[in-house]
């Protein structure tokens, strides 16, 4: 059925949105949550498995202590309370990627609860309250062969890779986020971006959205404006980029309003996000907790972190996001607007790494929020997924600072980086992009431009130095952009003085 979408402004005139975000973070432990199998990404299918993570009879699980430590550190960084005693539970359901027919998770006794994170959107601070952060194991990965979409519907057959089954996860669940109004999509994106940066700073995960090591489920509902109630929610599963988080919230708000305006009820269901078309489609009816028949995991002992251990881990935390933003803004000399734009674009960490690699703060910001953001938008990916690294961008800027490139030539170097042609220096050499430093060649090009534009030359002789721009353009064209515009201007004014 074709969905009826309501214009975003019209949605806000009639409804209040409420969001809930569930973010799954794969921890970078060396072994899985309940067994000793390795967790290396990209291994051959079904080569990192054992009787425990395959759910074979008689195999007994053992809790990964490093995963518990990482969970506590995440909880502390999110201002959560840490449970003095918690235990695992079996979440029972059947699906091919869950070989045990249950997932070992936590239910009513999570390890972390009652936290918050403050996020900034356009100068306005929103407090996102954390309901819980609990430990669980990841599922396997299904591959549906055949069909137009790669989904199970219409597939010829399906394959399952159990390498991912049992990898430690932390699921971070927010309370309903209300009051964001028109900024709801941006708040959702900002929260996931800031959470991702925090996870990376903690060193507990690489938080690669493109590889699925951090994934977001977006819950959304609409209620009549100013009613103070919560509507029926839908859950959009496995949204795998910051851009998609924002787009999914915006789309679901428009879709919900279309359904409600038509007098139909919202179905409580899970939905699939399609990055290529920017729409969601129905998945399955959303289950409630009782449908999973949770009960305590009998094969695992409870987890009881001591207060001394928790306080020891608290001492390992990096500075919180608010403190870090204030410090970096002061160090970099960014205005409030420049800092908000950097944070809002999810580029704070990548700009920081580029500066650390040798670029100036303004140059790092210029490239990532300008050129790289434009290319990422055209490709439909995040800037961090382009394949250009902070070290690459810093090196390009160093070449600009040394007078070996200008901005136009630098963009051609980025073309080469995206095409996989090597390092910036290798691309400059292979493409012959370096700025011409031969004074004789520059002087000859200036003489040629003056001879070809006598009227412009006369204006400059009469003191109208602004006219030099036309001659500079002519020289740059002749030199194919491989000249220092400032030096060309100097030569023109010297010759016409």
UniProtKB/Swiss-Prot annotation:
PROSITE patterns cross-referenced by the UniProt entry: GATB
A Pfam family recorded for this sequence: GatB_N
Transmembrane stretches, start-end: none
Highest taxon in the source lineage: Bacteria
Alphabetized PANTHER family for the sequence: GLUTAMYL-TRNA GLN AMIDOTRANSFERASE SUBUNIT B MITOCHONDRIAL AND PROKARYOTIC PET112-RELATED, GLUTAMYL-TRNA(GLN) AMIDOTRANSFERASE SUBUNIT B, MITOCHONDRIAL
Function: Allows the formation of correctly charged Asn-tRNA(Asn) or Gln-tRNA(Gln) through the transamidation of misacylated Asp-tRNA(Asn) or Glu-tRNA(Gln) in organisms which lack either or both of asparaginyl-tRNA or glutaminyl-tRNA synthetases. The reaction takes place in the presence of glutamine and ATP through an activated phospho-Asp-tRNA(Asn) or phospho-Glu-tRNA(Gln).
Subunit structure: Heterotrimer of A, B and C subunits.
Protein name per its UniProtKB record: Aspartyl/glutamyl-tRNA(Asn/Gln) amidotransferase subunit B
């Amino acid at each position: 059925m074709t969905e009826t979408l309501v214009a975003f402004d019209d949605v806000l005139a009639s409804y209040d949105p409420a969001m809930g975000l569930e973010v799954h973070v794969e921890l970078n432990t060396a072994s899985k949550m309940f067994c000793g199998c390795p967790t290396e990404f990209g291994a051959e299918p079904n080569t990192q498995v054992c009787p425990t993570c395959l759910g074979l009879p008689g195999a007994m699980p053992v809790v990964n202590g490093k995963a518990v430590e990482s969970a506590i550190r995440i909880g502390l960084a999110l201002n959560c309370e840490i449970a003095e005693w918690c235990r695992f539970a079996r979440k029972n359901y059947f699906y091919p990627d869950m070989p045990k027919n249950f997932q070992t998770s936590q239910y009513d006794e999570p390890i972390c609860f009652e936290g918050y994170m403050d996020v900034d959107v356009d100068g306005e601070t929103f407090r996102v309250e954390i309901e819980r952060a609990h430990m669980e194991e990841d599922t396997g990965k299904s591959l549906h062969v055949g069909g137009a979409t790669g989904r199970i519907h219409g597939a010829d057959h399906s394959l399952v890779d159990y390498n991912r089954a049992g990898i430690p996860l932390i699921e971070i669940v927010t309370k309903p986020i209300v009051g964001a109004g028109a900024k709801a999509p941006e708040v959702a994106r900002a929260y996931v971006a800031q959470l991702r940066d925090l996870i990376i700073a903690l060193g507990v995960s690489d938080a690669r959205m493109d590889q699925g090591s951090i994934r977001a489920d977006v819950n959304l509902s609409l209620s009549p404006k100013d009613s103070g109630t919560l509507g029926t929610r839908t859950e959009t599963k496995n949204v795998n980029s910051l851009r998609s988080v924002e787009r999914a919230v915006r789309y679901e708000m428009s879709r919900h309003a279309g359904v409600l305006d038509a007098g139909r009820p919202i179905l409580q269901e899970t939905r699939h996000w399609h990055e290529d078309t920017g729409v969601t489609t129905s998945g399955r009816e959303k289950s409630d907790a009782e449908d999973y028949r949770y009960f305590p995991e009998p094969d695992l002992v409870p987890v009881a972190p001591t207060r001394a251990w928790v306080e020891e881990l608290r001492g390992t935390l990096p500075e919180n996001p608010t403190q870090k933003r204030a410090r970096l803004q002061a160090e970099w000399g960014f205005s409030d607007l420049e800092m908000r734009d950097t944070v809002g674009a999810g580029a704070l960490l990548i700009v920081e790494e580029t500066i650390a690699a040798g670029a100036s703060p303004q140059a790092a910001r210029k490239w990532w929020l300008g050129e790289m953001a434009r290319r990422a938008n055209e490709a439909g990916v995040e800037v961090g997924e382009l394949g250009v690294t902070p070290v690459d961008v810093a090196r390009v800027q160093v070449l600009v600072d040394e007078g070996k490139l200008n901005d136009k030539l630098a963009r051609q170097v980025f073309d080469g980086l995206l095409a996989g042609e090597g390092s910036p220096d290798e691309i400059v050499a292979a493409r012959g992009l370096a700025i011409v430093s031969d004074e004789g060649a520059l002087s000859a090009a200036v003489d040629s431009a003056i001879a070809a534009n006598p009227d412009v030359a006369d204006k400059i002789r009469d003191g109208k130095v602004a006219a030099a721009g036309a001659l500079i353009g002519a020289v740059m064209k002749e030199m194919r952009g491989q000249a220092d515009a400032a030096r060309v201007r100097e030569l023109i004014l010297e010759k016409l003085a």
